[in-house]
UniProtKB/Swiss-Prot annotation:
Its main location: cytoplasm. It is found in: Cytoplasm. The keyword Disulfide bond does not apply. The gene is murF. This is UDP-N-acetylmuramoyl-tripeptide--D-alanyl-D-alanine ligase. One of its GO terms (cellular component) is cytoplasm. Involved in cell wall formation. Catalyzes the final step in the synthesis of UDP-N-acetylmuramoyl-pentapeptide, the precursor of murein. It comes from Rickettsia prowazekii (strain Madrid E). GO terms for biological process: cell division; cell wall organization; peptidoglycan biosynthetic process; regulation of cell shape.
């Protein structure tokens, strides 16, 4: 159990007379499982309207901030403010935890890096990893409040699209190890330059103690900028990974072997060779930082590296699925210029006679949008696409630059594509689906499956 009457009473500073034993904390009644604690938050919707639904799904306790009329009154915990109660629960967990806390941020690859580190550590330790990509302030509170007391390693991804957001998160999280996975042109709608994004990401190192460890990508354009910020913060315990000769860790060999890939890593003066089921090169690059953390923690890196074979690509994040007669690379969870180029490189690597790209526009790029979309054209051509379907306003710039020898079509939205292209998966093809989440390219897969 994650919470009981005693620990909840201490965390909330109130007397709880009812017997309470709960697992995870949920604020969305749709996510409630048997044994969970439901907290009624007020936002665009009032969580108090969903209390009975949460109880019907198995919630053993419900935190509310106003009187409600339900049958299971013994499950109600009344507080002055539900959100403040959640904050108190999160702070209680952090202050009383003996776990080592690891925080990961970056423009792309946060979730896959976090999940990979979790898989490598959980063979020998009790590991908690924040759920999905729930990486904002509310997500941090819910995740911390759902962490078991016996956790040995806690891994959190931290997201942001404005200055000051990560600073607010680390004031609570206080990570012992913090990594910036990469800096790229994401969220440029809210920033004027990559340097500004780097400054915002470097907030992850605020509140560092003397022995805390910073891990950065030496391949970043902003590498020297980040080093300067770390120097100003008086942080000296720094490790790096990437392609740079300065890096403590790097991927030095990536060789495809049919359905497998052979990888060689250099990690802190050690060479690691592994052969695992095929993964795209950008995933292999991300795992460099993961292996570096494993080595810093003093774990057996050769044994841990073998567990990379246990990592499976997921739907929406690069997994290949079959629809009718086609193989489909489902990479529509999100998109930035860097991840879009990486996905097209992935498409290039996978052998197929006929290749099709369905490219959704990349959102939140601000005044750089036209240029960053146009820069994808050579990657599309290099991937060997015979058909290209473009979805969303800014992909019109790609359409205009693609040569006429390629079969190309532009659609204002995904619904228009689904309506007009009725034979999408009928032929034996390899199809990449990639775009920002807001374009909703997942509807294509849902419609045809």
């Amino acid at each position: 159990m994650i919470w009981n009457s005693k620990t909840l009473s201490i965390a909330l500073g109130i007397e709880i007379s009812n017997s309470v034993n709960c697992n995870e904390v949920q604020f969305n009644s749709k996510d409630v499982k048997k044994g969970d604690l439901f907290i009624a938050l007020q936002g665009n919707r009032d969580g108090h309207d969903y209390i009975q639904d949460a109880i019907d799904k198995g919630a053993t306790a419900v935190i509310v901030s106003k009187q409600v009329e339900i049958n299971d009154k013994d499950k109600i915990i009344l507080v002055n403010n539900s959100f403040e109660a959640l904050q108190k629960m999160a702070l209680y967990k952090r202050e009383n935890s003996k776990a080592k806390f690891i925080a990961i941020t970056g423009s792309v690859g946060k979730t896959s890096t976090k999940e990979a580190l979790k898989i490598l550590l959980q063979h020998d330790f009790i590991v908690f990893a924040s759920r999905g990509n729930f990486n904002n302030y509310l997500g941090l509170l819910i995740n911390l409040a759902s962490m078991a007391d016996d956790t040995e390693y806690a891994i959190f991804e931290l997201g942001m699209n404005h200055q000051g957001e990560i600073s607010e998160l680390v004031q609570i999280l206080k990570p012992n190890i913090a990594m910036i996975n990469n800096i790229s042109e994401a969220h440029l709608e809210f920033f004027h330059s990559l340097e500004e994004i780097a400054e915002a990401k470097c907030e992850i190192f605020k509140n560092f103690s003397k022995n805390d460890i910073a891990i950065i990508n030496a391949s970043n354009n902003c590498y020297n900028k980040i080093l300067s910020i770390l120097k100003n913060l008086s942080i000296t315990n720094i490790y790096s990974f990437g392609h740079s000769s300065k890096a403590s860790a790097k991927l030095i060999l990536y060789k495809t072997l049919g359905e497998q890939v052979h990888l060689q890593y250099y990690i802190n003066n050690k060479f690691i060779d592994i052969t695992i089921p095929f993964i795209p090169r950008h995933f292999a690059n991300n795992y460099t930082g993961v292996l570096l953390i494993i080595d810093i923690l003093g774990k057996d890196i050769e044994i841990s590296a073998k567990y990379l074979a246990d990592i499976a690509l997921t739907k929406g994040r690069g997994k290949i699925i079959n629809i009718q007669n086609s193989r489909v690379i489902c990479d529509y969870y999100n998109a930035s210029p860097q991840s879009m180029k990486a996905a097209l490189e992935y498409l290039k690597q996978v052998p197929a006679d006929n290749k099709t790209s369905i490219i959704g526009e990349m959102l939140e790029l601000g005044w750089n949008s036209q240029r960053l979309h146009e820069e994808l054209v050579p990657y599309i051509l290099d991937a060997g696409c015979t058909k290209v379907y473009l979805v969303g306003a800014y992909t019109k710039y790609i359409y205009d630059l693609l040569p006429n020898k390629i079969s190309k079509k532009f659609f204002k939205n995904v619904e228009e594509l689904i309506t007009h292209i009725t034979d999408l998966f009928e032929y034996s093809e390899l199809i990449l689906i990639k775009g920002s989440r807001g374009v909703k390219l997942d509807k294509i897969v849902d419609y045809y499956q």
